[in-house]
């Protein structure tokens, strides 16, 4: 495989265009969330032989943030299957384009973040939803890893942890690195492991360095769980454990 070229994520559309999606997310999720869950849960479990570990670590009520690693467009489905609580998702703004998908996102609890911009609106939505006692999913790496290795955490999850003080649940997703996209769909076994919640003392206006420090601490927990899942998978298949999850 050749060296991956850096991607340009800056969305040229004005911030005003995305206000509608933030307003919708703050009001609640619509019928599309329930429909997607009803239609996709059983097929997802069966096709990907999905299993979860540690789901009891996810608080049944109160504000919290799930912080998974991210390989596949299917990851949000994998994480949500075994959780009864509804999840609000932060997603890159470029996903809000095709009319049908945009409608589903708008009414399904998904709100955009304009990567490449100083997008305070996204963080305002995060904090408003947490004030409402909601559960959010924010990918610790800030986007999908384009290799089959864990990426590096971005400061965003650290900022949320410090500015909100809510529990952060680290989540390891193993197997979805072979489920790259809808266009290149494969059906490996996928395992989700939920770690114990971790909280941080409130800090006003934490520096970017401090945000990254906390993000790294959170993602270190993801790395440990991911490495354990790699080892378990190798033991089941009788193969030597690959050297993954480092960085």
Predicted regions and their residues:
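Non-catalytic C-terminal accessory region of glycerolipid acyltransferases
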Residues: 1-32, 121-247
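A transmembrane-helix-recognition feature enriched in membrane-embedded lipid enzymes
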Residues: 2-54, 60, 78, 85, ...
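Residue-level "edge-of-site" marker
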Residues: 56, 118, 174
């Amino acid at each position: 495989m050749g060296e991956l070229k850096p991607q340009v994520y800056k969305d040229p559309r004005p911030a005003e265009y995305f206000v509608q999606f933030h307003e919708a997310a703050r009001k609640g999720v619509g019928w599309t969330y329930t429909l997607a869950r009803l239609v996709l849960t059983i097929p997802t479990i069966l096709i990907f032989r999905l299993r979860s570990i540690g789901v009891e670590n996810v608080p049944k009520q109160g504000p919290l943030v799930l912080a998974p690693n991210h390989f596949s467009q299917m990851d949000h489905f994998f994480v949500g299957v075994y959780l009864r609580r509804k999840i609000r998702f932060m997603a890159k703004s470029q996903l809000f384009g095709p009319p049908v998908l945009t409608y589903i996102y708008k009414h399904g609890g998904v709100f955009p973040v304009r990567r490449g911009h100083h997008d305070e609106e996204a963080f305002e939505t995060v904090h408003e939803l947490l004030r409402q006692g909601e559960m959010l999913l924010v990918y610790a790496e800030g986007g999908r890893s384009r290799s089959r290795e864990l990426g590096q955490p971005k400061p965003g999850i650290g900022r949320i942890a410090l500015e909100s003080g809510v529990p952060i649940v680290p989540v390891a997703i193993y197997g979805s690195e072979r489920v790259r996209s809808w266009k290149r769909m494969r059906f490996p076994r996928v395992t989700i492991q939920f770690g114990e919640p971790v909280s941080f003392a409130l800090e006003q206006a934490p520096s970017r360095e401090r945000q990254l420090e906390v993000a790294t601490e959170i993602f270190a927990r993801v790395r440990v769980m991911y490495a354990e899942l790699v080892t378990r998978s190798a033991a089941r298949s009788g193969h030597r454990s690959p050297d993954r999850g480092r960085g």
